Curated annotation (Swiss-Prot):
Gene3D superfamilies: Urease metallochaperone UreE, N-terminal domain (2.60.260.20), UreE, C-terminal domain (3.30.70.790). It comes from the Bacteria. Involved in urease metallocenter assembly. Binds nickel. Probably functions as a nickel donor during metallocenter assembly. This is Urease accessory protein UreE. It is found in: Cytoplasm. GO terms for biological process: protein folding; protein-containing complex assembly; urea metabolic process.
Length: 147
């Protein structure tokens, strides 16, 4: 069993001992009990409020390196050719504090029929797909205070 208390960031030159594949919701939690790809139990004890990143490296108490991978999960994918419609869609989702992954005139959200209907009414084409969900971290996630 590996106990993890330390984050190493997204760059590490040490060999990876095992990988854990996590959904977006799992990457958002500070305490996890998992099984690595090598079938070894992995317990994570990290600071809450700082989601794990896909590709991030963690270090166990015994010095072994564990890498975080993103799990493929069901997402709603919305797209359009019109930048104005796309901008409005992003605005309305942000106004609802919805976690959103943004590309060039496409976005992904967790499936939600109300939000999907809104996106459709704004002119976006909405489909469901299986993909790794990596939403934007948010404007205030860097932790700096400017008071």
């Amino acid at each position: 069993m590996l106990d993890i208390y330390e984050r190493l960031g997204t760059h590490c030159h040490d060999p990876v001992y095992t990988t854990v594949t996590l959904t977006h919701e799992q990457r958002d939690r500070g305490r996890l009990k998992l099984v690595g790809e090598n079938n070894e139990e992995v317990r994570v004890f990290l600071e809450r409020g700082k989601p794990l990143l896909v590709g991030e490296f963690l270090k166990s108490e015994c010095g072994k390196i564990v890498q975080v991978a993103g799990a493929v999960e069901d997402v709603a994918h919305a797209s359009c050719e019109d930048w104005e419609a796309f901008s409005k869609a992003c605005y309305h989702l942000g106004n609802r504090h919805t976690k959103i992954q943004i590309g060039e005139r496409w976005l992904r959200i967790k499936p939600d029929h109300v939000l999907e209907d809104m996106l459709h009414m704004l002119g976006l084409i909405v489909t469901h797909e299986e993909a790794v969900f990596v939403p934007e971290s948010g404007a205030y996630s860097h932790g700096h205070s400017h008071h």
